[in-house]
Amino acid sequence: MGGYIALNLVKRYSERIKGLILYDTQCYADNAQARAKRYENIALIRNGGKQKYLEDMCKILFSPVTFQQNGEIIKITLDLMLKATDEVLIQTLEAMAEREETCSILSAIKIPAMVLCGEHDILTPPEKSEYMQQQIPGSVLHVIANSGHLAHLENKDAFNQHLNNFLKSF
């Protein structure tokens, strides 16, 4: 959700921003099917299904490599997500379901920009990151190996290296 917020900040306050990192995100609004799925998940949460929803989310947040080699990080992440209130989860899903597209602003971005994505990200596949990088003049793209939607946890060394290099560049 951070990428959606960052793109809207650039849209409204570009003169205040020195650099942009778009990480495992996309510029598209939800289509009707994705929006309906978010509202199904809201209903599930309201009917006591928070644990099921979050367990299902973990199945698509992490790469197959992480499932095979680092089950502990999945457990820690699930435990952390379970601490969120139902209302926070519902408001987050509503915000994502109703967000506007921001693809139309990408070509106008004139600040340094880096796009990062996990090689095995199911939620925001690398093709969506490639599209954004191609639209933002002068931007760079890094696809982080052996990671899904949470590369900062799954392959933190590669993630941090790209982050540090970008931040040192300006």
How would you name each of these model-derived features?
Residues 45, 49, 81, 121-124, ...:
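Glycosyltransferase donor-binding loop in the core domain
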Residues 111, 125-134:
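Short alpha-helix in the alpha/beta-hydrolase fold that links the catalytic acid
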Residues 1-31:
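Conserved hydrolase catalytic core segment
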Residues 109, 115-117, 121:
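Short beta-strand/loop motif that positions the catalytic acidic residue
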Residues 29-36, 48-108:
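Conserved alpha/beta-hydrolase catalytic His-Asp/Glu region
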Residues 16-19, 112-114, 137-140:
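Structural signature of beta-strand start/N-cap positions in the alpha/beta core
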Residues 138-170:
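Catalytic active-site module of serine/aspartate enzymes centered on a nucleophile-bearing elbow/loop
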Residues 57, 93, 132, 159, ...:
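Hydrophobic "lid"/C-terminal helical patch
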